[in-house]
């Protein structure tokens, strides 16, 4: 997908010089980004970075102190109703009635948008198929697995056929199989032209799904770009994780062959274009465990913020 700056794709979301303060504390600071229609854009950042506040402003739930936000052609918050009718929301926690069946929960979702029962019943079969819940239509939600509940929540967010989906930590707490099934469903939505704004702590999720992403720290944008471009720009070489020794002592030994070194807890991260030379330097330390791997978004986050993403 072409980037918004170089394409004629319609703009789904535009933030221009947006800041937000609460009680004199700046929680979002001069933030600007544009999301093209049909792309998946990720917001990455530690707790307190401003992700939730940004989402609330996009939804018109709070107004920016400074700057302008436009969503699906409507300027928030004054035209919020025009935009909200075209937005589906998946919050971090399932908003389901456990005593209702799967079908009944979808009926409730539809009524939020003032859809008639006939209209809702018309779309329920396709939503059940999308969520892979055809055989669970009359099952109580309390009897579903965690992955099934998340797929039902996602299906509910699609009840009004939204142009834009806002997903807050959509796979947190799921096992790998359930997580991959959600990712597959989200990719199918992108293939249908839906726009997705994704906030996540899961770096693999961001790397797999996002066309572009924005890394936040203390309310400021510290990086923006395509995942693999950011990895190449910020890291650009293999990584060796070193466990079992004194990180400070080991860093002095291997520094001449390292492009950069990072210490996180008891782990030494060595970014090096010459992994074999580093391994040779460490052979005398029999108690060490080494993991050599390609760089990833977790490394980018550590590089930019100096700390790991909270789990």
UniProtKB/Swiss-Prot annotation:
Membrane-related topology note: Peripheral membrane protein
Binding sites annotated in the UniProt record for ATP: 45-52
InterPro entries: AAA+_ATPase, ABC_transporter-like_ATP-bd, ABC_transporter-like_CS, ABC_transporter_ATP-binding, ABC_transptNodI, P-loop_NTPase
A GO CC annotation given for this chain: plasma membrane
Protein's UniProt keywords contain Translocase: yes
EC number(s) given by UniProt: 7.6.2.-
Pfam family, one: ABC_tran
Residue pairs linked by disulfide bridges in the UniProt entry: none
Domain ABC transporter per the UniProt entry, residue ranges: 13-243
Family: Belongs to the ABC transporter superfamily. Lipooligosaccharide exporter (TC 3.A.1.102) family.
Record's function text: Part of the ABC transporter complex NodIJ involved in the export of the nodulation factors (Nod factors), the bacterial signal molecules that induce symbiosis and subsequent nodulation induction. Nod factors are LCO (lipo-chitin oligosaccharide), a modified beta-1,4-linked N-acetylglucosamine oligosaccharide. This subunit is responsible for energy coupling to the transport system.
Protein name: Nod factor export ATP-binding protein I
Gene designation per UniProt: nodI
């Amino acid at each position: 997908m072409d980037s918004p700056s170089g394409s004629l794709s319609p703009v789904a979301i535009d933030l221009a010089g947006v800041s937000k303060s609460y009680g004199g504390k700046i929680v979002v600071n001069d933030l600007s980004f544009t999301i093209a229609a049909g792309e998946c854009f990720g917001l990455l950042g530690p707790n307190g970075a401003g992700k939730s506040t940004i989402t609330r402003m996009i939804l018109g739930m709070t107004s920016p102190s400074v700057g302008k936000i436009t969503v699906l052609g409507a300027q928030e918050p004054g035209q919020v109703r025009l935009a909200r009718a075209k937005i589906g929301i998946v919050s971090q926690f399932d908003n389901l009635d456990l005593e209702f069946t799967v079908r009944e929960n979808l009926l409730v979702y539809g009524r939020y948008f003032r859809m008639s029962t006939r209209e809702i019943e018309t779309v329920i079969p396709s939503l059940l198929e999308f969520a892979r819940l055809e055989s669970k239509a009359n099952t109580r939600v309390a009897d579903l697995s965690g992955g099934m509940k998340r797929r039902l929540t996602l299906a509910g967010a699609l009840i009004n056929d939204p142009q834009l989906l806002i997903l807050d930590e959509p796979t947190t707490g799921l096992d790998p199989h359930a997580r991959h099934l959600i990712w597959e469903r989200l990719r199918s939505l992108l293939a249908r032209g839906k726009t997705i704004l994704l906030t996540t702590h899961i770096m693999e999720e961001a790397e797999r799904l996002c066309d572009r992403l924005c890394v936040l720290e203390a309310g400021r944008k510290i990086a923006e770009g395509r995942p693999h471009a950011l990895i190449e720009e910020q890291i650009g070489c293999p990584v060796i994780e070193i466990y079992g020794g004194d990180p400070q002592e080991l860093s002095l030994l291997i520094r001449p062959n390292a492009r950069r070194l990072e210490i996180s807890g008891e782990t030494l991260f060595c970014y090096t274009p010459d992994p074999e030379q580093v391994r040779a330097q460490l052979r005398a330390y029999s108690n060490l465990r080494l993991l050599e791997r390609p760089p990833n978004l977790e490394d980018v986050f550590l590089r930019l913020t100096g700390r790991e993403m909270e789990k």
